[in-house]
Amino acid sequence: MALKMAVVVDYQNVHLTAADLYMPGCPPEEALIDPYRFASQLAQARNATNDDAHQVEVSRVEVFRGLPIPEDDSDAYRRNQAQKAQWTRGHHGVVNVTLRPLKYSWEYIDGVRRPVRSSRQEKGVDVLCALMLVDLARCGLYDVVVLASRDTDLAPALDNAARTGRAKVEAAKWYHPGVPSTRGRIKTERRLWTTSMTEQHFLSSLDPLDYA
């Protein structure tokens, strides 16, 4: 019987890292990743390096992503909402997508308060990922909990989850044989298993839909 695997996805980190690595020079939206496809490819990559007793199946995918506000970019806001709806369709109870509004500086133009697009940035997504990682590791519903992110600020969350949780805590990363920086891992108190995902896994994770 396969082990139950839950995956916490730091979406922009996973998406943009893959875009830079495998599709340099292309618009990031061409490298859009479908979370369930990604988790399935992660399971496939992990299973290829484990024996029959340690095979996993995707049981839950928690996705956290920044969301442009409509006052700044109504088209991007609409696309993000459409993507969330598409990614969760058919995966009720398995895939959850949490969109957190981006943070902005504001300015007044002709007396109207407007967001400064160049100032927008994700805030709090890493905290949400950390909290979910620990919760999933502790809840007792999953055998394996994987963090998909290269954000080193999440190392303490991995340590906490591994130390206090009931599940086996792991990480996932993109790997390219020609890029030395992809050979490393997030440094934690004790070495955690990290599944390396390749360009083929990336291509099989892509969302084929056009949200324009």
Set out the residue ranges of the language-model regions.
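Nuclease catalytic cores that cleave nucleic-acid phosphodiester bonds
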Residues: 96-212
